[in-house]
């Protein structure tokens, strides 16, 4: 926060332009989240438990050389010299934000190292990780909140703007990939393509069919939860498909997104529902004569939650959490579609007929409910998924990044190719086990590999 105006519309537009990178410098950043449960009682770990979240963070910091991140004397995250970090989602979900890396071999290896570290610690401390899109057993009031002030502000505001925002915060997990863009034209094409295709990713990665020990009626309950969270900051912004879309239009959209907080001198101030535009003009209620800094703008960008989000890179946000092979498969899917020019052209051609917000809203619910058997526009999602996997496979082949054994990045698409071959999403497989060998005992879910 500043005492004089240092930001204007042109400068915050420039911030997105400053994210442009030459093709040879494009990197891949992967983020993935896990639920942590006590192994004996199958309750979500709380922050202050004897061997809870804070204890785990301290153990990683002290034994594995991670730097601590604190807020109000509470340990809330870690960062590593490699560029990766560990942060806490509102209900104690562990999120690894991977370092930006050059190829999928590197990013998959990084995810594997993190999971192996967490498995080692989980065995020592008697907790279990679960890689799903939605907590399969816990009720809202059984989940403890993490001591982060921004979460307290969001917790208080969410019920005013939607029915499922609290569930989104504490009962969901996702896998995301962050990708670069060359210039404004490239950003536009990647943004429009990926936004129109998110329901396909939602279907392929659907992995959240349970709620509170029962069937949820959805294959991706996580995706459905987002449909009733906060319509002003989530979903499919129609501006993305407008003929004049670009950095300026995206900035206008973000200025229309209500604020949540201001962070200044180590303290969070609740400004939920207020206007960033007024803040820019020094007229924010309660903060008259104060103006945003660039870091205030960066914070504000993080409280928009569309299915694809532009920061200084593009975030793909439509997939459920899952195990290691799908943590590798999600970036592989999108890198194959967007990081090779022919693949981008081909996937844009596929996506073009879906670039309608009403259609996409319907398609997301269809994907969440029926997975590959859902509908996108006039097409079956399974058919579009097959076309996209073919395009992605060819794109990864043309990238021609091979590991030390000469194997290309296409190997990371294998879980998705198997899904299409069998016609069963991860959620379908869970339902088959639940209704079969598990004999409807939801606690058998803790035996699956994560």
Report residues per predicted region:
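Terminal catalytic/cofactor-binding subdomain
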Residues: 1-163, 171, 206, 326, ...
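Structured core elements
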Residues: 35, 95, 176-180, 315-317
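Long, well-ordered mid-to-C-terminal structural blocks that present hydrophobic/aromatic surfaces
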Residues: 274-358
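Charged, low-complexity interaction regions
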Residues: 400-404
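Solvent-exposed residues in well-ordered beta-strands and their adjoining turns
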Residues: 37-39, 99, 180-182, 319, ...
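Loop-rich catalytic cores of soluble enzymes, especially ATP-dependent carboxylate-amine ligases
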Residues: 123-124, 129-130, 134-309
């Amino acid at each position: 926060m500043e005492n004089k105006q240092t930001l204007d519309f042109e400068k915050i537009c420039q911030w997105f332009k400053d994210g442009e990178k030459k093709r040879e410098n494009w990197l891949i950043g992967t983020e993935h989240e896990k639920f942590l449960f006590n192994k004996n009682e199958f309750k979500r770990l709380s922050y202050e438990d004897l061997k809870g979240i804070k204890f785990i963070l301290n153990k990683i910091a002290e034994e594995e050389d991670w730097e601590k991140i604190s807020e109000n004397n509470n340990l809330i995250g870690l960062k590593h010299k490699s560029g990766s970090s560990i942060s806490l989602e509102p209900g104690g979900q562990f999120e690894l934000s991977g370092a930006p890396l050059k190829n999928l071999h590197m990013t998959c290896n990084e995810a594997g190292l993190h999971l192996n570290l967490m498995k080692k610690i989980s065995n020592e401390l008697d907790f279990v990780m679960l890689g799903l899109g939605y907590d399969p057993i816990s009720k809202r009031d059984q989940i403890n909140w993490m001591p982060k002030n921004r979460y307290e502000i969001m917790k208080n505001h969410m019920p005013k703007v939607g029915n499922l925002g609290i569930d989104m915060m504490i009962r969901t997990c996702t896998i995301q990939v962050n990708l670069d863009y060359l210039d404004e034209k490239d950003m536009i094409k990647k943004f429009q393509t990926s936004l129109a295709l998110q329901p396909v990713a939602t279907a392929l990665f659907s992995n959240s069919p349970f709620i509170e020990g029962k069937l949820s009626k959805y294959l991706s309950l996580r995706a459905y939860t987002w449909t009733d969270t906060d319509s002003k900051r989530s979903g499919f912004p129609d501006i993305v498909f407008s003929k004049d879309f670009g950095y300026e239009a995206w900035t206008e959209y973000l200025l229309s997104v209500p604020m949540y907080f201001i962070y200044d001198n180590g303290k969070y101030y609740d400004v939920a529902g207020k206007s960033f535009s007024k803040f820019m003009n020094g007229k924010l209620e309660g903060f008259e004569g104060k103006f945003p800094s660039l870091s205030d703008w960066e914070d504000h960008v993080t409280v928009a939650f569309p299915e694809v989000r532009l920061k200084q890179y593009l975030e793909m946000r439509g997939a459920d959490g899952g195990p290691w092979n799908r943590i590798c498969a999600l970036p592989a899917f999108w890198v194959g579609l967007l990081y090779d020019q022919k693949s981008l052209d081909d996937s844009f051609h596929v996506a073009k007929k879906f670039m309608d917000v009403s259609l996409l809203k319907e398609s997301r619910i269809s994907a969440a409910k029926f997975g590959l058997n859902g509908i996108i526009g006039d097409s079956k999602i399974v058919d579009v998924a097959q076309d996209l996997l073919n395009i992605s496979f060819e794109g990864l082949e043309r990238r021609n990044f091979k590991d030390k054994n000469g194997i290309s990045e296409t190997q990371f698409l294998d879980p998705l190719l198997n899904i299409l071959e069998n016609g069963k999403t991860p959620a379908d497989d869970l339902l088959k086990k639940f209704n079969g060998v598990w004999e409807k005992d939801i606690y058998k879910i803790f035996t699956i590999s994560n």
